[in-house]
Regions:
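Conserved structural motif at the start of ABC-family nucleotide-binding domains
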Residues: 2, 17-19
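Helical segment within the ABC ATPase nucleotide-binding domain
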Residues: 169-181
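Catalytic Walker B motif of ABC-type/P-loop ATPase nucleotide-binding domains
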Residues: 154-158
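H-loop/switch region of ABC-family ATPase nucleotide-binding domains
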Residues: 189-191
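Helix-to-loop junction immediately C-terminal to a conserved catalytic motif
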Residues: 48
Length: 235
């Protein structure tokens, strides 16, 4: 589904991402982990064609993302608050997304229903603009907006940030569910190793822009190796 070949990004003479070859199959749930500056967000931005690669390419379903816009019709993503439209209410924002993806109002209501617990009655019906919500609720709105389009490909950058523990557990379950039930290809970056290990089928460890480990994660098997790399002592 996603193919990366000789992908390189350079900022001010410094190579911040350099991945020779990476293939992600349809239906995989891939966790990106690494310390700050490892290149996780840069990789996601390149997959979404938000920044230009200095070398190499990214393909989605066989087409280069910088040469075709077909992938946009089946891709959902949330990187940060700049993806939101601050002067809209949540209802208006989700309706806007529905218009972009051809989702009618009734279908949109059905797709929002599984997120009711996640929203904690703090988002819909509040008559607030997105700019007036807390960081946590803005994060929720952005994630929901990416998922309600029922994408074939879903990319989320640090989806557990700003969320309370119950919301973190809730969204982890929903991400795993969408992958399992719809065969969605999911790529998430996170510093939360436990959640990544709990839901990911595969974990990619980046260091200074390079892919240094590609770990299969059957039954959470990768967590021990990740803990060793990050210097986390087992209890």
């Amino acid at each position: 589904m996603i193919k990366i070949q000789n992908l390189k990004k350079i900022y001010n003479g410094t190579t911040v991402l350099d991945i020779e070859n990476l293939d992600i199959a349809q239906g995989e749930l891939v966790g990106l982990v690494g310390n700050n500056g490892a290149g996780k967000t840069t990789l996601l931005r390149l997959v979404l064609d938000l920044i230009k690669a200095d070398d190499g390419f990214v393909e989605s379903d066989g087409k280069k993302v910088n040469e075709s816009e077909d992938w946009k019709t089946y891709t959902g993503s949330y990187i940060d608050g700049r993806f939101l439209v601050d002067f809209l209410t949540p209802e208006e924002y989700f309706s806007f997304i529905g218009d972009l993806y051809g989702i009618d109002d009734e279908t949109m209501k059905e797709r929002l229903a599984p997120f009711e617990t996640f929203m904690h009655d703090e988002i819909m019906g509040t008559k607030k603009y997105l700019r007036d919500f807390s960081q946590g609720n803005r994060q929720k709105i952005g994630i929901i907006g990416a998922m309600i389009v029922n994408p074939k490909v879903l990319l989320l950058d640090e989806p557990f940030n700003y969320l309370d523990p119950s919301s973190q557990m809730n969204i982890a379950r929903l991400i795993h569910q969408v992958c399992k039930e719809h065969g969605t290809t999911v790529i998430i970056s996170s510093h939360n190793l436990n959640f990544v290990a709990d839901i990911s089928s595969r974990i990619l460890l980046l260091e200074k822009g390079r892919l240094i480990k590609d770990l299969q994660n059957t039954d959470g098997a990768a967590i021990a190796e990740l803990n060793e790399y990050f210097g986390i002592q087992a209890e």
